[in-house]
């Protein structure tokens, strides 16, 4: 199902729906999960990436690619207790978790990043996992006071784009700190 500015994916067997919408703010998406029957468990969102680099990335000194050889690639998290914490992807050697109301978690690079943006309405368990078969993973689960309760839906926000300070300051607390990694 497709509309103006959104795509809806439906699993006819389970009734699960996923609607991906482009928000008015550039570089930001809303991903809404909904199941009319409910699902046992916690809402979650996760991003995956490899350690690979763009095929057109210059790395040869003579071609002007010296800076790209040491370009920072990591994961960053912002929580109510820590405004900004970052670690290089290759330094993540064990699973890491932190609980926080609001905040965000992101894969960061020198000029661009992809961030899952939390809401002040929920408590998140942000996680980062070490590399497994060439893939890095990070994301969150949404915590609930109702243990084992049914979940019918959740809306996630995803930012994928450039690090422009004035733009990032309007999206989420401390998001602009990813610029000064």
Predicted regions and their residues:
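Soluble non-transmembrane domains of integral membrane proteins
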Residues: 1-180
């Amino acid at each position: 199902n497709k509309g103006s500015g959104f795509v809806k994916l439906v699993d006819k067997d389970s009734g699960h729906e996923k609607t991906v919408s482009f928000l008015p703010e550039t570089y930001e998406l809303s991903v809404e999960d909904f199941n009319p029957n409910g699902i046992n468990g916690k809402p979650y969102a996760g991003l995956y990436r490899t350690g690979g680099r763009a095929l057109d990335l210059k790395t040869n000194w003579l071609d002007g690619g010296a800076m790209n050889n040491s370009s920072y690639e990591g994961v960053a998290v912002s929580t109510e207790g820590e405004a900004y914490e970052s670690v290089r992807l290759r330094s993540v050697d064990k699973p890491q978790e932190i609980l926080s109301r609001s905040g965000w978690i992101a894969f960061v690079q020198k000029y661009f990043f992809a961030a899952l943006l939390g809401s002040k309405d929920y408590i998140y368990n942000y996680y980062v996992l070490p590399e497994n078969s060439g893939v890095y993973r990070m994301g969150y689960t949404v915590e609930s006071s109702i243990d084992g309760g049914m979940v019918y839906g959740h809306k996630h926000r995803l930012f994928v784009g450039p690090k422009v300070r004035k733009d990032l300051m309007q999206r989420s607390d401390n998001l602009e700190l990813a610029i000064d990694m």
